């Protein structure tokens, strides 16, 4: 096995990358739920870097097995894999397709590279006889879109349509409906913004009424949208200006999940590869249809933490059903129940992420995934320059510092169900922090 770097022409980037990887490796196997255990927990961790690594790094990270993409460790992991996980990497909002208002998102190069790798690994798995491997595509939404997502019921009410119909309605039509509803039904955003900015609401009354609580959360999110903009004062702006700002925010809102786009891209990639190998149409359709059946889309998450907390229950449920448990009964189980039933079952997860994202993905997967999982991490072939990679990795390291502190010291647990609950409350609950606060914490986080 040889993963040693061949070239040293980009030493600064390599030095930074290996320093960051060393920091991450030192934090593996942490367990705040059992701080007094004499023996630290352990598991098999295999790391397949796209860029080679030095012998020095391998010596500094004895907890990690470094492997080549064609190495025996990878061959065995793919052949045994219960699941292949495609970690999403943001999105780019573009002008929506004509007649398809919900399709306004473009996958970034990192997600495209990850998706190509996942398709290749799936074909490798079925060629080895592993024909029941599950594929999970995670979803991502930038934390800047949380407020718009939360305020969506208000936009729906302003337009006089159901919330689920908003993303399927064109921007032009939404504006027409909102303006019409304002005239005909006197719907005024100023009232909601004012209510969200005062302390006149009876918290006891709101807490006793889930519908009022939901509306309060929506109204506060609406106010955050306005407070985040430099061109508007929510307390003095006219109704028309508030409406324009809300519609402008919605125009930039991603309306289709990256998990859906990655699944579609993967199915297309696999079909094209099989066609290039000379497979006939019937063979291609059979393989692609089975891949479609065995693929799950994780709902949009705010960050990589919630990517895992949302995906883990799906992966455990899939394993239990494969083991013969009734699907309806599994659907009623808590995450803790699923973990307990599978505690003695060795499972293998192959996780694909890009170079900059991978160190944090590795730490989070080890921290959040149950200990019965063996983990193999494979970096995708992202064609970014080293300068772009380093800038991205520096942002990731800041997020790693913030996130590890959040999980270890503030949450104090690695139970994925509990972490998911706490994270959802932090992002979506009535006491959630604002987008501005989230971004400020990320930007101000000092790397130790």
What do these predicted ranges mean?
Residues 388-448:
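Glycine-rich flexible loop motifs, especially short His-Gly-Gly/GGXG/HXGH segments used as catalytic or interaction
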Residues 1-11, 15, 447-448:
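Non-Sec secretion/translocation targeting segments of pathogen effectors
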